[in-house]
């Protein structure tokens, strides 16, 4: 892709997201979502093959449907209130449609079916943008309208997302699909804690950091399957250790960073005398931890059959420069001791 065109597309994606986050008018929010959607499709189709075309088409149809639901909710709200303000939804039907539209854009269950297929069909770099940056705009709108949302509806979507995000990743060998199901589960944790926006923001930051770290290491090793992940010992032994730590952190294993948001969300829910919901969420999170432990096992403790050429890859240095990777790994794995400092947010 032409560098000027690529830069223009990236700037459009950033502008669309920023437009959604800073706008207080529903029409500007809708325009921001459309800019975001139309700009990312050429990036998803960087590799000209049928799989990328199929993934881009699925993404376009899903996001178009979500945008249609969003505009329908805005029009219903306008009929009842006469206002275009983002902060408040005055009609229960408008609130329900808006929640469904944003859940579809975030890839939450039961509107999650597009996420694994689209992520699997696009390059790793496009998957990184899809699973990180593209979550910011819908999450910011969801945060702004949370007082108007039916609490039972959003908690149901959260529980379904955590459950399906864990179940779906159990039988996967494709790393992009595993990251997609992990994204679905993390969206469930974030929306379950929307009543405490600081914890939602903390969860979002840690999720984006961990996901960016994993995709950066996958791209450095050109790794897309469990089999190719097991060969990283031959290519970059040190990076293999970093992959292990980040995988366990994404699974929420203490004492790594990924445990922090889960711990704080469960603690906050129990303070509000909610026992059954956090217990179910904690048990369901074990499904995610299981498939991450399985990835860790196949990477660190097993060696799949490989040719002699594959075994000699350690002789050739990794030529890709990754300036920010050490910082990202530290943030993804070692921030749990900073948890007491977060008490100032309460």
UniProtKB/Swiss-Prot annotation:
One of its GO terms (cellular component) is mitochondrial inner membrane. It catalyses: a ubiquinone + NADH + 5 H(+)(in) = a ubiquinol + NAD(+) + 4 H(+)(out). GO terms for biological process: mitochondrial electron transport, NADH to ubiquinone; mitochondrial respiratory chain complex I assembly. Its EC number is 7.1.1.2. It is an enzyme of class 7 (translocase). It is a multi-pass membrane protein. Keywords: Electron transport, Membrane, Mitochondrion, Mitochondrion inner membrane, NAD, Respiratory chain, Translocase, Transmembrane, Transmembrane helix, Transport, Ubiquinone. It is found in: Mitochondrion inner membrane. Coiled coil: none annotated. GO terms for molecular function: NADH dehydrogenase (ubiquinone) activity. The chain crosses the membrane at residues 3-23, 25-45, 67-87, 96-116, 122-142, 145-165, 200-220, 238-258, 273-293, 324-344. Belongs to the complex I subunit 2 family. Core subunit of respiratory chain NADH dehydrogenase (Complex I) which is composed of 45 different subunits. Interacts with TMEM242. Core subunit of the mitochondrial membrane respiratory chain NADH dehydrogenase (Complex I) which catalyzes electron transfer from NADH through the respiratory chain, using ubiquinone as an electron acceptor. Essential for the catalytic activity and assembly of complex I. This is NADH-ubiquinone oxidoreductase chain 2. It comes from Bos mutus grunniens (Wild yak). The lineage of its organism: Eukaryota, Metazoa, Chordata, Craniata, Vertebrata. The gene is MT-ND2.
């Amino acid at each position: 892709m032409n560098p000027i065109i690529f830069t223009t597309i990236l700037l459009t994606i950033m502008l669309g997201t920023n437009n959604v986050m800073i706008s207080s008018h529903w029409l500007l929010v809708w325009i921001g979502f459309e800019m975001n959607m139309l700009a990312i499709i050429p990036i998803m189709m960087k590799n000209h093959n049928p799989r990328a075309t199929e993934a881009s088409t699925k993404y376009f149809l899903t996001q178009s449907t979500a945008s249609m639901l969003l505009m329908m909710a805005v029009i219903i709200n306008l009929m009842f209130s006469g206002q275009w303000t983002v902060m408040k939804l005055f009609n229960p039907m408008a609130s329900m449609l808006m929640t469904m539209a944003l859940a579809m854009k975030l890839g939450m269950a039961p509107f999650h079916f597009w996420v694994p297929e689209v992520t699997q069909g696009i390059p790793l770099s496009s998957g990184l943008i899809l699973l990180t940056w593209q979550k910011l705009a819908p999450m910011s709108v969801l945060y702004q309208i949370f007082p108007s949302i039916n609490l039972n509806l959003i908690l149901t979507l959260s529980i379904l997302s955590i459950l399906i995000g864990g179940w779906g990743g159990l039988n996967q060998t494709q790393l992009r699909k595993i990251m997609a199901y992990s994204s679905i589960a993390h969206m469930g944790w974030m929306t379950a804690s929307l009543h405490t926006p600081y914890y939602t923001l903390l969860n979002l930051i840690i999720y984006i950091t961990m996901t960016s770290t994993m995709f950066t290491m996958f791209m450095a090793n050109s790794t897309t399957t469990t089999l190719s992940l097991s060969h990283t010992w031959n290519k970059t032994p040190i990076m293999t250790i970093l992959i292990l730590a980040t995988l366990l952190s994404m699974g929420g294993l203490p004492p790594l960073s990924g445990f922090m948001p889960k711990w704080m969300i469960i603690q906050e829910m129990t303070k509000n005398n909610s026992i059954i919901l956090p217990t179910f969420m904690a048990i369901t999170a074990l499904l995610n931890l299981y498939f991450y432990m399985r990835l860790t096992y196949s990477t660190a403790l097993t060696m799949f059959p490989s040719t002699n050429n594959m075994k000699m890859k350690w002789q050739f240095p990794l030529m890709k420069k990754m300036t920010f990777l050490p910082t990202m790994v530290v943030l993804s794995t070692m921030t749990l001791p900073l948890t007491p400092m977060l008490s100032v947010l309460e």
